[in-house]
Amino acid sequence: MSAEIVYSTDALIDLDEAWDFTVEISGDPDLAFQQVDALLEAVEGARSYPLAGSRLDVVVGTPTDSRYVVAGRLLAVYSIEEHFNRVDRIFDTRQDWVSVLVRRG
């Protein structure tokens, strides 16, 4: 059975900002839609196989049960809950996303 996917407020804001950033640097809204769509598909893949995402603790160097998926230049950090997967944050891979997450913790 597939888990429901829930996006945090931060993740939804991040998604908008990722789209804006891609349009700003590329000048191509279609490219931004393609990148966002690819990330949403990767997150959807984690619905059925939540452990398929990479372990975040290996990257940030601190204990966490969170995982992440990457699609193109976008990355989604998610937590596996009992009945759903919560997408906590979304980053452009060109950001210093590890520092953002370490400061959060």
Stretch-by-stretch model annotation:
Residues 1, 52-55, 65, 87, ...:
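Glycine-rich, flexible loop/turn motifs
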Residues 3, 66-67, 76:
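Residue-level detector of beta-strand structural context in well-folded domains
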Residues 70-105:
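Enriched for short, Lys/Arg-rich terminal
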Residues 20, 27, 44, 48-51, ...:
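Generic structural signal for secondary-structure transition and capping sites
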Residues 1-38:
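Arg/Lys-rich, positively charged N-terminal/basic patches that mediate binding to nucleic acids
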